[in-house]
């Protein structure tokens, strides 16, 4: 079937859909991909009718039942592909990139990966203790930066949007200043416990964890999912409360059938 792949993007006028757009990823593939990506988008851009109702219409039109676990698999696949697509510029930003947008996508897609993995494997995501309230050492300097940006005169919608993106990045940095060092220390401790050796720097721990995962057998999946979910869960705790984290806070698996 011809699929849009990044589906669910419609132009609507007075309650009627007028156009589809964003077809650069379109291809021949499994039509359940479009149901999966429509469902992902539905969490923050509602489609209108409940998704289970739309799925029922699809089943009536095709005469075939939808494989609901296959939909979740495609959620996992799309989320993983998207994360890999942005990981380069998130880790090493390119001049002129929409940095705040990519951070938002990265955080939300990683959350989607974890939810899909948990559903498909049956491994529950770990419960994390709440972050303690604290203020980072650079709080006064960052407050000055926020104040300076707020008084910066700008003219035009494009300039206002750019200014808002800078404010979002500053808020992200503030959260990293408040809790980032503690998060890294906890992540290093978890990886050290799993691998049985200590690390001084997170980059060394992350590289060792990646090498371990590449060699691990399926019997270690549950333990690895728990570690990765803990690491990414802490990241969501850290940046979820920001403006850029709003999409990640609303990520849920597509509900493709009525309970």
What positions do the PLM features span?
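Charged/polar, low-hydrophobicity segments characteristic of intrinsically disordered regions
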Residues: 72-77, 107-127, 196-218
């Amino acid at each position: 079937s011809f699929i849009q792949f990044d589906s669910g993007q419609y132009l609507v006028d007075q309650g009627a859909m007028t156009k589809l757009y964003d077809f650069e990823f379109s291809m021949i593939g499994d039509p359940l991909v479009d149901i999966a990506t429509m469902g992902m988008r539905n969490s923050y851009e509602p489609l209108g009718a409940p998704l289970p109702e739309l799925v029922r219409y699809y089943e009536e039109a095709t005469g075939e039942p939808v494989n609901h676990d296959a939909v979740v698999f495609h959620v996992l696949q799309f989320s993983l592909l998207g994360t890999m697509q942005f990981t380069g510029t998130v880790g090493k930003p390119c001049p002129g990139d929409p940095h705040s947008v990519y951070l938002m996508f990265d955080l939300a897609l990683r959350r989607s990966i974890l939810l899909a993995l948990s559903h498909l494997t049956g491994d529950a995501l770990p419960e994390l203790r709440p972050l303690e309230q604290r203020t980072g050492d650079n709080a006064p300097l960052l407050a000055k930066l926020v104040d300076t940006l707020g008084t910066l005169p700008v003219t035009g919608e494009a300039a206002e949007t750019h200014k808002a993106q800078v404010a979002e990045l500053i808020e992200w940095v503030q959260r990293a200043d408040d809790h980032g060092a503690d998060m890294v220390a906890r992540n290093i401790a978890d990886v050290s416990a799993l691998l049985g050796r200590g690390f001084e720097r997170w980059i060394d721990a992350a590289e060792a964890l990646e090498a371990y995962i590449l060699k691990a057998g399926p019997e270690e999946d549950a333990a690895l999912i728990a570690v990765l979910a803990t690491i990414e869960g802490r990241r969501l705790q850290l940046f979820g409360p920001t403006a850029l984290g709003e999409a990640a806070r609303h990520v849920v698996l597509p509900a493709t059938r009525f309970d």
